[in-house]
Amino acid sequence: MDYDLLIKNGQTVNGMPVEIAIKEKKIAAVAATISGSAKETIHLEPGTYVSAGWIDDHVHCFEKMALYYDYPDEIGVKKGVTTVIDAGTTGAENIHEFYDLAQQAKTNVFGLVNISKWGIVAQDELADLSKVQASLVKKAIQELPDFVVGIKARMSRTVIGDNGITPLELAKQIQQENQEIPLMVHIGSAPPHLDEILALMEKGDVLTHCFNGKENGILDQATDKIKDFAWQAYNKGVVFDIGHGTDSFNFHVAETALREGMKAASISTDIYIRNRENGPVYDLATTMEKLRVVGYDWPEIIEKVTKAPAENFHLTQKGTLEIGKDADLTIFTIQAEEKTLTDSNGLTRVAKEQIRPIKTIIGGQIYDN
């Protein structure tokens, strides 16, 4: 068989030998060894890992925004990330402009449409409910079916003004009117209170910033235990997503949750230019290292940046190393080296291992990291 690209001598994160062949931008073969010729062959060094391309399901990468912005390839292909999902930076009135720009990126870019029609042009996009127009959201979803993979509602004090839980009620209505499209909900300081938010969320809805260190988070700061209503949401199938961000990941909360048996379903950064350049986020790999230091193992960490986000946002051609899927791969090493990691609240932990992307393959095209 003649392939476009053959990757030799790789191993999965579980340590199993793997070789991958690519033809016409799709995975054509996956096996311990593959024979056959290819236009290009990559021979990996011993101890090099290959996974499905990493997916970051919470980023902000519409470069024309002033508040939260970045450039898809700076947080994507250059960092070992093959696919990013912009989490509601734009709304129905400006998502088409974002779409046009996103098509120029090497990185695969998808978007969640903010239920507020201009997105995050200011911090309080849900303070004026006249900006939430279901018909406009529906139009955006219908006009950009290969780009819009969900909707976003930011449910915290600085965003909602005096509107309480109402914006989330509107978001749930919009979701129901659009074939139960995925919904991501941002949480932060009250109001609204987290128990009100979680009561409205259903199985498959994505709760981002799940391990924030705020009083309105999942941890009861008086008892140092996970709140009962957070467990109820977790057990009914609400998707707990990291969404690290500048203010929204706390080591102690994540460690306490793990001790009690609660794990994030997906790992994401909430990255934008300032927390990329100045920290504490930097990139997806650093966020993955933080979950390793909390106590997650590498195979589950990789699953939480590949298969899990692909399933949550219905990216059916991505997320696994299977024949016929898109030829998006991340090639990386895991080195035994110490590194101090800092969360959003200034807490530090010393990682014993560093994960480093060395090549990113998107649609069969190779990019060095």
From Swiss-Prot:
**Which InterPro entries does this entry report, sorted A to Z?**
Deacetylase_Atu3266-like, EF_0837-like, Metal-dep_hydrolase_composite, Metal_Hydrolase
User: Its domain of life?
Assistant: Bacteria
List the Gene3D superfamilies: Metal-dependent hydrolases (3.20.20.140), Urease, subunit C, domain 1 (2.30.40.10)
The UniProt keyword set, sorted, is:
Hydrolase, Metal-binding, Zinc
Q: Which residues bind Zn(2+) 2?
A: 152, 186, 209
Site feature Transition state stabilizer, where: 154
**What span is annotated as the signal peptide, if there is one?**
none
Q: Which Pfam family, any one, appears in the UniProt record? A: EF_0837-like_N
In its UniProt record, a GO molecular function of this protein is: deacetylase activity
In terms of PANTHER family, this protein maps to: DIHYDROOROTASE-RELATED (PTHR42717), IMIDAZOLONEPROPIONASE AND RELATED AMIDOHYDROLASES (PTHR42717:SF1)
For this entry, the protein name equals Deacetylase EF_0837
**Native species of this protein?**
Enterococcus faecalis (strain ATCC 700802 / V583)
